[in-house]
Amino acid sequence: MTGESGAAAAPSITLNDEHTMPVLGLGVAELSDDETERAVSAALEIGCRLIDTAYAYGNEAAVGRAIAASGVAREELFVTTKLATPDQGFTRSQEACRASLDRLGLDYVDLYLIHWPAPPVGKYVDAWGGMIQSRGEGHARSIGVSNFTAEHIENLIDLTFVTPAVNQIELHPLLNQDELRKANAQHTVVTQSYCPLALGRLLDNPTVTSIASEYVKTPAQVLLRWNLQLGNAVVVRSARPERIASNFDVFDFELAAEHMDALGGLNDGTRVREDPLTYAGT
């Protein structure tokens, strides 16, 4: 299946709850309502089926409008949203899920994530309990976490006996998250990457541009392909339709092992987003 741009539809990965999720999706963090509607519409047109938003982004309603206008059948879509830190708690997380559904104009989300563990707040386990309830009531097909460390995930599993389906984390060659990816895999948790382009910081990197020229691909396409070949699912943000089409045109080539290693070797621990160990969350 291809969209008008020629970009192939992303393959899917099976989660530990047996639901399936596309391996590549559109993120809409920090986009205005107008930008969000245009971006989601453009993504759906070229075959993207995973849309990732959050209460904290303030654009759930815009995502919902674009989905409604697209004519794409609900069962073809995979919609993710996230629980904000102020809504952590057993009851509040369930109320927040229903409120997100109202804004999205949907009966359920495919994936509901705790946006940040927010250790200073100390409520993520209670929030997880509420999300288990939301899943049981059919408001969320799958539930997971974002920005969680291995210790946070182990704590959830030990206290609730329910394993997250996904851990969405900052991941790019400057922060390759090898140890956390291994820990996720040990618990059958899918690693989903955000900021795969390191907010653009890697687009002019000599290693990246050199590899891109060898494959006659853009630096962004090479960075996305690297992430996908690690076995990760990926969410990539863009407001520009032509860039969205290019970002999803990454399934017709494969990076050689030496190029994978060269990109992974750029790891220096650089974060472009907040540190989950100390951040109180949004």
UniProtKB/Swiss-Prot annotation:
Gene Ontology MF terms: aldo-keto reductase (NADPH) activity
Transmembrane segments: none
Gene3D superfamilies given in the database record: NADP-dependent oxidoreductase domain
Residues forming the catalytic site: Y57
Coiled coil residues, start to end: none
Induction: Induced in response to the thiol oxidant diamide.
E.C. numbers: 1.1.1.-
A Pfam family: Aldo_ket_red
Record bears the keyword Oxidoreductase: yes
Keywords attached to this entry: NADP, Oxidoreductase
Enzyme class per UniProt: oxidoreductase
Binding residues for NADPH: L197, V235, R237, S238, A239, R243, S246, N247, R273
Family recorded in the similarity comment: Belongs to the aldo/keto reductase family.
Protein name per UniProt: Aldo-keto reductase BQ2027_MB2996
